[in-house]
Amino acid sequence: MEFSVKSGSPEKQRSACIVVGVFEPRRLSPIAEQLDKISDGYISALLRRGELEGKVGQTLLLHHVPNVLSERILLIGCGKERELDERQYKQVVQKTINTLNDTGSMEAVCFLTELHVKGRNTYWKVRQAVETAKETLYTFDQLKSNKVEARRPLRKMVFNVPTRRELTSGERAIQHGLAIAAGIKAAKDLGNMPPNICNAGYLASQARQLADNYAGAVTTRVIGEQQMKELGMNAYLAVGQGSQNESLMSVIEYKGNPNPDARPIVLVGKGLTFDAGGISLKPGEGMDEMKYDMCGAASVYGVMRMAAELRLPLNIVGVLAGCENMPGGRAYRPGDILTTMSGQTVEVLNTDAEGRLVLCDVLTYVERFEPELVVDVATLTGACVIALGHHLTGLMANHNPLASELLNAAEQAGDRAWRLPLGEEFQEQLDSNFADMANIGGRPGGAITAACFLARFTRKYNWAHLDIAGTAWRSGKAKGATGRPVAMLSQFLLNRAGLNGEE
Protein backbone atom coordinates (compact mmCIF):
# COMPACT_ATOMS: atom_id res chain seq x y z
CA MET A 1 0.00 0.00 0.00
CA GLU A 2 1.32 3.44 -0.96
CA PHE A 3 1.15 6.56 1.21
CA SER A 4 1.83 10.18 0.37
CA VAL A 5 1.04 13.66 1.66
CA LYS A 6 -0.19 16.77 -0.09
CA SER A 7 -1.69 20.11 0.76
CA GLY A 8 -4.74 21.19 -1.19
CA SER A 9 -8.38 22.21 -0.96
CA PRO A 10 -11.05 19.47 -1.14
CA GLU A 11 -12.88 20.90 -4.15
CA LYS A 12 -9.77 20.33 -6.32
CA GLN A 13 -9.38 16.66 -5.41
CA ARG A 14 -10.05 14.25 -8.26
CA SER A 15 -9.97 10.89 -6.50
CA ALA A 16 -11.93 7.68 -6.06
CA CYS A 17 -12.88 8.92 -2.59
CA ILE A 18 -12.44 11.85 -0.22
CA VAL A 19 -12.54 11.12 3.52
CA VAL A 20 -13.81 13.83 5.89
CA GLY A 21 -14.98 13.89 9.49
CA VAL A 22 -18.35 14.63 11.10
CA PHE A 23 -18.70 15.46 14.79
CA GLU A 24 -21.57 14.89 17.18
CA PRO A 25 -24.32 15.99 16.95
CA ARG A 26 -24.35 16.13 13.13
CA ARG A 27 -21.66 18.83 12.96
CA LEU A 28 -19.51 19.03 9.87
CA SER A 29 -15.75 19.35 10.23
CA PRO A 30 -14.23 22.42 8.51
CA ILE A 31 -13.26 20.38 5.42
CA ALA A 32 -16.72 18.78 5.27
CA GLU A 33 -18.22 22.28 5.45
CA GLN A 34 -16.22 23.28 2.37
CA LEU A 35 -17.56 20.27 0.47
CA ASP A 36 -21.06 21.04 1.67
CA LYS A 37 -20.77 24.59 0.35
CA ILE A 38 -19.54 23.33 -3.03
CA SER A 39 -22.45 20.87 -3.22
CA ASP A 40 -25.04 23.56 -2.35
CA GLY A 41 -25.88 22.03 1.04
CA TYR A 42 -26.21 18.44 -0.19
CA ILE A 43 -24.24 16.96 2.75
CA SER A 44 -25.86 19.02 5.52
CA ALA A 45 -29.30 18.13 4.15
CA LEU A 46 -28.47 14.43 4.55
CA LEU A 47 -27.36 14.99 8.14
CA ARG A 48 -30.54 16.89 8.97
CA ARG A 49 -32.49 13.85 7.79
CA GLY A 50 -30.61 11.75 10.36
CA GLU A 51 -28.38 9.81 7.96
CA LEU A 52 -25.35 10.22 10.26
CA GLU A 53 -25.16 11.32 13.90
CA GLY A 54 -21.37 11.62 14.08
CA LYS A 55 -20.66 9.01 16.76
CA VAL A 56 -17.14 7.55 16.66
CA GLY A 57 -16.86 5.03 13.84
CA GLN A 58 -20.17 5.72 12.10
CA THR A 59 -19.82 5.94 8.32
CA LEU A 60 -21.82 7.21 5.38
CA LEU A 61 -20.54 6.68 1.84
CA LEU A 62 -21.87 9.19 -0.69
CA HIS A 63 -21.71 8.72 -4.46
CA HIS A 64 -21.55 11.46 -7.11
CA VAL A 65 -22.07 14.43 -4.80
CA PRO A 66 -23.07 17.49 -6.85
CA ASN A 67 -20.19 19.71 -8.02
CA VAL A 68 -17.53 17.49 -6.35
CA LEU A 69 -14.83 16.10 -8.65
CA SER A 70 -14.21 12.93 -6.64
CA GLU A 71 -16.41 9.90 -7.28
CA ARG A 72 -17.28 9.39 -3.62
CA ILE A 73 -17.15 11.07 -0.24
CA LEU A 74 -16.77 9.01 2.92
CA LEU A 75 -18.19 10.73 5.99
CA ILE A 76 -16.74 9.26 9.17
CA GLY A 77 -18.05 9.93 12.68
CA CYS A 78 -15.45 11.41 15.03
CA GLY A 79 -17.47 11.84 18.22
CA LYS A 80 -17.53 15.13 20.09
CA GLU A 81 -15.07 17.62 18.67
CA ARG A 82 -13.51 18.63 21.99
CA GLU A 83 -13.11 15.01 23.07
CA LEU A 84 -11.20 13.71 20.05
CA ASP A 85 -8.14 12.08 21.60
CA GLU A 86 -5.42 9.68 20.46
CA ARG A 87 -7.47 6.54 21.05
CA GLN A 88 -10.55 7.83 19.22
CA TYR A 89 -8.44 9.17 16.35
CA LYS A 90 -6.93 5.72 15.79
CA GLN A 91 -10.41 4.15 15.97
CA VAL A 92 -11.63 6.57 13.31
CA VAL A 93 -8.67 5.81 11.04
CA GLN A 94 -9.17 2.07 11.52
CA LYS A 95 -12.84 2.30 10.59
CA THR A 96 -11.94 4.43 7.58
CA ILE A 97 -9.41 1.92 6.28
CA ASN A 98 -11.79 -1.01 6.72
CA THR A 99 -14.61 0.82 4.95
CA LEU A 100 -12.44 1.90 2.01
CA ASN A 101 -10.98 -1.59 1.64
CA ASP A 102 -14.39 -3.26 1.79
CA THR A 103 -16.14 -0.89 -0.63
CA GLY A 104 -13.63 -1.02 -3.48
CA SER A 105 -12.08 2.43 -3.08
CA MET A 106 -8.63 1.57 -4.34
CA GLU A 107 -7.30 5.06 -3.61
CA ALA A 108 -8.43 7.93 -1.42
CA VAL A 109 -7.53 11.39 -0.18
CA CYS A 110 -7.87 11.56 3.60
CA PHE A 111 -8.50 14.86 5.40
CA LEU A 112 -8.68 13.28 8.88
CA THR A 113 -5.06 14.33 9.41
CA GLU A 114 -6.31 17.93 9.54
CA LEU A 115 -8.54 17.24 12.55
CA HIS A 116 -7.51 18.68 15.90
CA VAL A 117 -6.32 15.91 18.22
CA LYS A 118 -5.52 17.16 21.69
CA GLY A 119 -1.80 17.70 22.17
CA ARG A 120 -0.80 16.11 18.85
CA ASN A 121 0.85 17.65 15.79
CA THR A 122 0.71 16.84 12.08
CA TYR A 123 3.68 14.47 12.27
CA TRP A 124 1.93 12.39 14.94
CA LYS A 125 -1.40 12.32 13.10
CA VAL A 126 0.13 11.22 9.80
CA ARG A 127 2.43 8.65 11.40
CA GLN A 128 -0.34 7.13 13.48
CA ALA A 129 -2.58 7.00 10.41
CA VAL A 130 0.09 5.05 8.52
CA GLU A 131 0.75 2.65 11.39
CA THR A 132 -2.98 2.14 12.01
CA ALA A 133 -3.65 1.54 8.33
CA LYS A 134 -0.97 -1.14 8.11
CA GLU A 135 -2.20 -2.70 11.36
CA THR A 136 -5.81 -2.74 10.12
CA LEU A 137 -4.93 -4.50 6.87
CA TYR A 138 -2.58 -7.04 8.48
CA THR A 139 -3.36 -10.69 7.90
CA PHE A 140 -1.41 -13.85 8.64
CA ASP A 141 -2.38 -16.32 5.95
CA GLN A 142 0.99 -17.76 4.93
CA LEU A 143 -0.08 -21.23 6.02
CA LYS A 144 -3.61 -21.20 4.57
CA SER A 145 -4.26 -23.06 1.34
CA ASN A 146 -7.10 -20.69 0.39
CA LYS A 147 -6.29 -17.02 0.82
CA VAL A 148 -9.20 -14.56 0.93
CA GLU A 149 -8.41 -11.25 -0.75
CA ALA A 150 -10.53 -8.15 -1.26
CA ARG A 151 -11.74 -7.82 -4.86
CA ARG A 152 -10.63 -4.20 -5.12
CA PRO A 153 -8.33 -3.62 -2.13
CA LEU A 154 -7.18 -0.21 -0.97
CA ARG A 155 -3.88 0.50 -2.72
CA LYS A 156 -3.11 4.17 -2.18
CA MET A 157 -3.82 6.71 0.55
CA VAL A 158 -3.01 10.41 0.35
CA PHE A 159 -3.03 12.37 3.61
CA ASN A 160 -3.81 16.05 3.37
CA VAL A 161 -2.00 18.51 5.64
CA PRO A 162 -3.19 22.06 6.36
CA THR A 163 -0.21 23.99 4.91
CA ARG A 164 2.62 23.39 2.48
CA ARG A 165 5.21 23.99 5.19
CA GLU A 166 3.94 20.84 6.91
CA LEU A 167 4.63 18.62 3.90
CA THR A 168 8.17 17.83 5.06
CA SER A 169 6.89 16.81 8.48
CA GLY A 170 4.23 14.65 6.85
CA GLU A 171 6.73 12.94 4.56
CA ARG A 172 9.00 12.20 7.51
CA ALA A 173 6.01 10.82 9.40
CA ILE A 174 5.25 8.42 6.53
CA GLN A 175 8.87 7.26 6.41
CA HIS A 176 8.95 6.61 10.16
CA GLY A 177 5.47 5.11 10.20
CA LEU A 178 6.26 2.63 7.43
CA ALA A 179 9.47 1.51 9.13
CA ILE A 180 7.74 1.03 12.48
CA ALA A 181 4.79 -0.73 10.84
CA ALA A 182 7.21 -3.09 9.06
CA GLY A 183 8.87 -3.82 12.40
CA ILE A 184 5.49 -4.53 13.98
CA LYS A 185 4.55 -6.81 11.09
CA ALA A 186 7.83 -8.70 11.39
CA ALA A 187 7.22 -9.21 15.12
CA LYS A 188 3.64 -10.34 14.52
CA ASP A 189 4.66 -12.74 11.77
CA LEU A 190 7.24 -14.36 14.05
CA GLY A 191 4.77 -14.54 16.92
CA ASN A 192 2.02 -16.08 14.82
CA MET A 193 4.27 -18.71 13.26
CA PRO A 194 3.56 -22.18 14.72
CA PRO A 195 6.15 -23.73 17.05
CA ASN A 196 6.82 -26.68 14.74
CA ILE A 197 8.27 -24.10 12.33
CA CYS A 198 9.41 -21.27 14.57
CA ASN A 199 12.00 -22.73 16.93
CA ALA A 200 15.31 -21.23 18.06
CA GLY A 201 16.87 -22.23 14.74
CA TYR A 202 14.17 -20.36 12.85
CA LEU A 203 14.77 -17.25 14.97
CA ALA A 204 18.47 -17.54 14.19
CA SER A 205 17.77 -17.82 10.45
CA GLN A 206 15.65 -14.66 10.59
CA ALA A 207 18.41 -12.85 12.47
CA ARG A 208 20.93 -13.89 9.82
CA GLN A 209 18.56 -12.79 7.06
CA LEU A 210 18.33 -9.36 8.69
CA ALA A 211 22.11 -9.06 8.45
CA ASP A 212 21.96 -10.05 4.78
CA ASN A 213 19.22 -7.50 4.07
CA TYR A 214 21.13 -4.67 5.74
CA ALA A 215 24.69 -5.71 4.96
CA GLY A 216 27.25 -3.23 6.20
CA ALA A 217 25.01 -1.94 8.98
CA VAL A 218 23.92 -5.19 10.66
CA THR A 219 25.90 -8.25 11.70
CA THR A 220 24.55 -11.40 13.37
CA ARG A 221 26.28 -14.03 15.47
CA VAL A 222 24.51 -17.18 16.64
CA ILE A 223 25.73 -18.82 19.84
CA GLY A 224 24.91 -22.50 20.25
CA GLU A 225 24.76 -24.79 23.25
CA GLN A 226 28.44 -25.77 23.19
CA GLN A 227 29.56 -22.14 23.33
CA MET A 228 26.95 -21.39 26.00
CA LYS A 229 28.39 -24.22 28.07
CA GLU A 230 31.88 -22.75 27.71
CA LEU A 231 30.50 -19.37 28.82
CA GLY A 232 28.87 -20.91 31.89
CA MET A 233 25.29 -20.12 30.82
CA ASN A 234 23.96 -23.08 32.80
CA ALA A 235 20.56 -21.58 33.68
CA TYR A 236 19.78 -20.87 30.03
CA LEU A 237 20.95 -24.34 29.02
CA ALA A 238 18.91 -26.06 31.74
CA VAL A 239 15.64 -24.68 30.41
CA GLY A 240 16.19 -26.22 26.98
CA GLN A 241 17.39 -29.63 28.19
CA GLY A 242 14.02 -31.31 27.69
CA SER A 243 13.70 -30.21 24.07
CA GLN A 244 15.07 -31.91 20.97
CA ASN A 245 15.60 -28.44 19.46
CA GLU A 246 18.91 -26.79 20.27
CA SER A 247 18.87 -23.57 22.28
CA LEU A 248 20.38 -20.75 20.23
CA MET A 249 21.13 -17.16 21.19
CA SER A 250 21.12 -14.78 18.22
CA VAL A 251 23.12 -11.57 18.73
CA ILE A 252 22.25 -8.84 16.22
CA GLU A 253 24.54 -5.79 16.15
CA TYR A 254 23.56 -2.59 14.37
CA LYS A 255 26.14 0.18 14.12
CA GLY A 256 24.70 3.48 12.99
CA ASN A 257 26.52 5.90 15.28
CA PRO A 258 29.21 7.93 13.48
CA ASN A 259 31.40 6.89 16.40
CA PRO A 260 31.61 3.09 16.08
CA ASP A 261 32.96 2.86 19.63
CA ALA A 262 29.95 4.63 21.16
CA ARG A 263 28.38 2.52 23.89
CA PRO A 264 25.39 0.61 22.54
CA ILE A 265 21.79 0.37 23.62
CA VAL A 266 21.11 -3.31 24.29
CA LEU A 267 17.70 -4.93 23.80
CA VAL A 268 17.15 -8.46 25.10
CA GLY A 269 14.14 -10.54 24.05
CA LYS A 270 12.87 -13.70 25.71
CA GLY A 271 12.48 -16.24 22.92
CA LEU A 272 10.71 -19.31 24.33
CA THR A 273 9.37 -20.59 21.04
CA PHE A 274 7.14 -22.97 22.97
CA ASP A 275 6.65 -23.17 26.72
CA ALA A 276 4.97 -26.35 27.92
CA GLY A 277 6.11 -25.51 31.44
CA GLY A 278 8.61 -28.36 31.55
CA ILE A 279 8.17 -30.87 34.39
CA SER A 280 5.87 -28.30 36.06
CA LEU A 281 3.53 -28.88 33.14
CA LYS A 282 1.00 -26.22 32.21
CA PRO A 283 -2.75 -27.03 31.95
CA GLY A 284 -3.75 -28.27 28.51
CA GLU A 285 -6.37 -25.59 27.92
CA GLY A 286 -4.86 -22.67 26.08
CA MET A 287 -1.42 -24.27 25.90
CA ASP A 288 -1.37 -23.60 22.14
CA GLU A 289 -0.93 -19.92 22.99
CA MET A 290 2.44 -20.70 24.54
CA LYS A 291 3.89 -20.31 21.05
CA TYR A 292 3.63 -16.60 21.91
CA ASP A 293 6.21 -16.95 24.69
CA MET A 294 8.81 -15.77 22.18
CA CYS A 295 7.12 -12.44 21.52
CA GLY A 296 9.82 -10.60 23.47
CA ALA A 297 12.42 -11.83 21.00
CA ALA A 298 10.04 -11.13 18.12
CA SER A 299 9.61 -7.52 19.23
CA VAL A 300 13.37 -7.02 19.59
CA TYR A 301 13.77 -8.39 16.06
CA GLY A 302 11.13 -5.95 14.80
CA VAL A 303 12.80 -3.00 16.50
CA MET A 304 16.20 -3.93 15.06
CA ARG A 305 14.63 -4.05 11.61
CA MET A 306 13.13 -0.59 12.13
CA ALA A 307 16.46 0.86 13.29
CA ALA A 308 18.30 -0.55 10.29
CA GLU A 309 15.61 0.62 7.86
CA LEU A 310 15.78 4.21 9.16
CA ARG A 311 19.56 4.12 9.56
CA LEU A 312 19.26 5.53 13.06
CA PRO A 313 22.50 7.20 14.26
CA LEU A 314 22.79 4.81 17.21
CA ASN A 315 24.66 1.66 18.09
CA ILE A 316 22.18 -1.06 19.11
CA VAL A 317 22.56 -4.69 20.09
CA GLY A 318 19.53 -6.98 19.96
CA VAL A 319 19.67 -10.42 21.57
CA LEU A 320 17.09 -13.09 20.72
CA ALA A 321 17.23 -15.69 23.50
CA GLY A 322 15.85 -18.70 21.63
CA CYS A 323 14.86 -21.78 23.60
CA GLU A 324 12.07 -24.33 24.15
CA ASN A 325 10.78 -25.52 27.54
CA MET A 326 9.56 -29.11 27.28
CA PRO A 327 9.09 -32.07 29.63
CA GLY A 328 11.23 -35.14 29.01
CA GLY A 329 13.79 -37.51 30.43
CA ARG A 330 16.54 -34.88 30.16
CA ALA A 331 14.42 -31.96 31.38
CA TYR A 332 15.49 -29.97 34.42
CA ARG A 333 13.52 -30.59 37.61
CA PRO A 334 12.02 -28.75 40.57
CA GLY A 335 14.70 -28.95 43.25
CA ASP A 336 17.64 -28.58 40.85
CA ILE A 337 20.23 -25.96 41.76
CA LEU A 338 21.80 -24.12 38.83
CA THR A 339 24.98 -22.06 38.72
CA THR A 340 24.35 -19.05 36.50
CA MET A 341 26.87 -17.30 34.27
CA SER A 342 27.27 -14.66 36.99
CA GLY A 343 28.28 -17.32 39.51
CA GLN A 344 25.12 -16.90 41.56
CA THR A 345 23.16 -20.07 42.28
CA VAL A 346 19.42 -20.60 41.81
CA GLU A 347 17.14 -23.23 43.32
CA VAL A 348 14.47 -24.26 40.84
CA LEU A 349 11.11 -24.44 42.60
CA ASN A 350 9.03 -24.35 39.44
CA THR A 351 10.26 -25.20 35.94
CA ASP A 352 7.51 -23.02 34.48
CA ALA A 353 9.31 -19.94 35.81
CA GLU A 354 11.86 -20.49 33.08
CA GLY A 355 12.00 -17.13 31.32
CA ARG A 356 13.95 -15.51 34.13
CA LEU A 357 16.48 -18.37 34.05
CA VAL A 358 17.14 -17.76 30.36
CA LEU A 359 17.22 -13.99 30.78
CA CYS A 360 19.52 -13.93 33.81
CA ASP A 361 22.35 -15.49 31.82
CA VAL A 362 21.73 -13.25 28.81
CA LEU A 363 21.71 -10.17 31.06
CA THR A 364 25.11 -11.28 32.36
CA TYR A 365 26.37 -11.99 28.84
CA VAL A 366 25.57 -8.48 27.58
CA GLU A 367 27.91 -6.90 30.15
CA ARG A 368 30.67 -7.46 27.56
CA PHE A 369 29.17 -4.73 25.37
CA GLU A 370 29.63 -2.12 28.14
CA PRO A 371 26.10 -0.92 27.34
CA GLU A 372 24.75 2.56 27.79
CA LEU A 373 21.54 0.87 28.94
CA VAL A 374 19.75 -2.47 28.70
CA VAL A 375 16.04 -3.13 28.17
CA ASP A 376 14.71 -6.66 28.34
CA VAL A 377 11.34 -7.61 26.87
CA ALA A 378 9.56 -10.74 28.03
CA THR A 379 6.20 -12.45 28.33
CA LEU A 380 7.29 -13.14 31.88
CA THR A 381 4.43 -13.42 34.36
CA GLY A 382 0.72 -14.12 34.53
CA ALA A 383 0.81 -11.87 37.59
CA CYS A 384 1.40 -8.87 35.32
CA VAL A 385 -1.75 -9.76 33.39
CA ILE A 386 -3.72 -9.82 36.65
CA ALA A 387 -2.24 -6.46 37.69
CA LEU A 388 -2.52 -4.52 34.42
CA GLY A 389 -4.83 -6.53 32.19
CA HIS A 390 -4.25 -6.59 28.46
CA HIS A 391 -3.91 -2.84 27.95
CA LEU A 392 -0.69 -1.85 29.70
CA THR A 393 2.82 -3.28 29.55
CA GLY A 394 4.47 -3.63 32.94
CA LEU A 395 7.65 -1.56 33.37
CA MET A 396 10.22 -1.95 36.12
CA ALA A 397 13.66 -0.34 36.22
CA ASN A 398 16.71 0.27 38.38
CA HIS A 399 17.18 3.76 36.90
CA ASN A 400 14.48 6.42 37.19
CA PRO A 401 15.51 8.53 34.14
CA LEU A 402 15.41 5.42 31.93
CA ALA A 403 11.97 4.49 33.26
CA SER A 404 10.74 8.03 32.54
CA GLU A 405 12.13 7.91 29.00
CA LEU A 406 10.33 4.66 28.28
CA LEU A 407 7.04 5.85 29.78
CA ASN A 408 7.24 9.03 27.72
CA ALA A 409 7.91 7.01 24.55
CA ALA A 410 4.99 4.73 25.39
CA GLU A 411 2.61 7.70 25.62
CA GLN A 412 3.95 9.24 22.41
CA ALA A 413 3.53 5.99 20.50
CA GLY A 414 0.15 5.05 21.95
CA ASP A 415 1.74 1.80 23.16
CA ARG A 416 1.13 2.36 26.83
CA ALA A 417 3.02 1.06 29.85
CA TRP A 418 2.72 1.38 33.62
CA ARG A 419 5.58 1.43 36.08
CA LEU A 420 5.55 -1.07 38.93
CA PRO A 421 7.84 -0.79 41.98
CA LEU A 422 11.12 -2.64 42.30
CA GLY A 423 11.70 -2.35 46.04
CA GLU A 424 14.26 -4.22 48.12
CA GLU A 425 11.45 -5.34 50.42
CA PHE A 426 10.35 -7.80 47.73
CA GLN A 427 13.76 -9.46 47.48
CA GLU A 428 13.35 -11.58 50.60
CA GLN A 429 10.56 -13.51 48.87
CA LEU A 430 13.28 -15.06 46.70
CA ASP A 431 15.25 -16.44 49.66
CA SER A 432 16.29 -20.09 49.44
CA ASN A 433 17.62 -22.44 52.12
CA PHE A 434 19.91 -24.14 49.63
CA ALA A 435 21.01 -21.58 47.02
CA ASP A 436 21.58 -17.85 46.63
CA MET A 437 17.99 -17.46 45.51
CA ALA A 438 14.89 -19.34 44.37
CA ASN A 439 13.42 -18.88 40.91
CA ILE A 440 9.97 -17.93 42.26
CA GLY A 441 8.86 -15.75 45.14
CA GLY A 442 5.29 -16.91 45.74
CA ARG A 443 2.01 -15.42 44.55
CA PRO A 444 2.15 -11.93 46.15
CA GLY A 445 3.59 -9.39 43.73
CA GLY A 446 4.62 -12.06 41.24
CA ALA A 447 5.46 -9.63 38.42
CA ILE A 448 7.62 -7.60 40.81
CA THR A 449 9.49 -10.55 42.33
CA ALA A 450 10.26 -11.83 38.82
CA ALA A 451 11.82 -8.45 38.02
CA CYS A 452 13.61 -8.48 41.39
CA PHE A 453 15.16 -11.79 40.35
CA LEU A 454 16.44 -10.22 37.12
CA ALA A 455 17.65 -7.14 38.98
CA ARG A 456 20.26 -9.30 40.73
CA PHE A 457 21.95 -9.74 37.34
CA THR A 458 21.80 -6.11 36.16
CA ARG A 459 23.81 -4.24 38.79
CA LYS A 460 26.53 -3.15 36.36
CA TYR A 461 24.34 -1.02 34.07
CA ASN A 462 21.12 0.97 33.82
CA TRP A 463 18.33 -1.49 33.10
CA ALA A 464 14.59 -1.65 32.47
CA HIS A 465 12.31 -4.67 32.23
CA LEU A 466 9.15 -4.79 30.11
CA ASP A 467 6.68 -7.54 31.06
CA ILE A 468 4.48 -7.99 27.99
CA ALA A 469 2.60 -11.10 29.16
CA GLY A 470 -0.70 -9.21 28.91
CA THR A 471 -0.02 -7.20 25.77
CA ALA A 472 1.95 -9.45 23.39
CA TRP A 473 -1.05 -11.30 21.95
CA ARG A 474 -4.83 -11.48 21.88
CA SER A 475 -6.92 -14.55 22.61
CA GLY A 476 -10.34 -15.58 21.33
CA LYS A 477 -11.78 -14.64 17.96
CA ALA A 478 -9.12 -11.99 17.35
CA LYS A 479 -6.32 -14.38 18.37
CA GLY A 480 -2.92 -13.28 17.19
CA ALA A 481 0.28 -11.47 18.08
CA THR A 482 0.00 -7.70 18.60
CA GLY A 483 3.56 -6.67 17.81
CA ARG A 484 3.81 -4.77 21.08
CA PRO A 485 6.00 -3.14 22.32
CA VAL A 486 7.72 -2.47 18.97
CA ALA A 487 6.02 0.93 18.70
CA MET A 488 7.12 1.97 22.20
CA LEU A 489 10.74 0.89 21.75
CA SER A 490 10.87 2.41 18.26
CA GLN A 491 9.73 5.73 19.69
CA PHE A 492 12.30 5.40 22.48
CA LEU A 493 15.06 4.97 19.91
CA LEU A 494 13.74 7.79 17.71
CA ASN A 495 13.80 10.07 20.74
CA ARG A 496 17.34 8.97 21.52
CA ALA A 497 18.32 9.73 17.93
CA GLY A 498 16.70 13.19 18.06
CA LEU A 499 14.05 12.20 15.50
CA ASN A 500 10.93 12.49 17.62
CA GLY A 501 8.87 14.56 15.18
CA GLU A 502 8.50 17.57 17.47
CA GLU A 503 7.99 20.79 15.56
Curated annotation (Swiss-Prot):
Single GO molecular function: metalloaminopeptidase activity
UniProt entry keywords in alphabetical sequence = Aminopeptidase, Cytoplasm, Hydrolase, Manganese, Metal-binding, Protease
A Gene Ontology annotation in the biological process aspect, one of them, is: proteolysis
Where is the protein situated, by its record's location annotation? Cytoplasm
One Pfam match, by short name?
Answer: Peptidase_M17
Reaction equations catalysed: Release of an N-terminal amino acid, Xaa-|-Yaa-, in which Xaa is preferably Leu, but may be other amino acids including Pro although not Arg or Lys, and Yaa may be Pro. Amino acid amides and methyl esters are also readily hydrolyzed, but rates on arylamides are exceedingly low; Release of an N-terminal amino acid, preferentially leucine, but not glutamic or aspartic acids
Give the cofactor note text.
Answer: Binds 2 manganese ions per subunit.
Active site residues according to the UniProt entry: 282, 356
Positions that bind Mn(2+) 2: 270, 275, 293, 354
EC number(s) of the enzyme? 3.4.11.1, 3.4.11.10
Q: Which domain of life is it from?
A: Bacteria
SUPFAM superfamilies attached to this UniProt entry? Macro domain-like, Zn-dependent exopeptidases
Q: Which residues bind Mn(2+) 1?
A: 275, 352, 354
Gene Ontology cellular component list = cytoplasm
Which leading EC class covers this enzyme? Answer: hydrolase
Cofactor annotation: Mn(2+)
Q: Which HAMAP family match?
A: Cytosol_peptidase_M17
Name the family the entry cites. Answer: Belongs to the peptidase M17 family.
Purpose: Presumably involved in the processing and regular turnover of intracellular proteins. Catalyzes the removal of unsubstituted N-terminal amino acids from various peptides.
What this protein is called in its record is Probable cytosol aminopeptidase
Source organism per entry reads Edwardsiella ictaluri (strain 93-146)
Phylogenetic placement of the source organism = Bacteria, Pseudomonadati, Pseudomonadota, Gammaproteobacteria, Enterobacterales
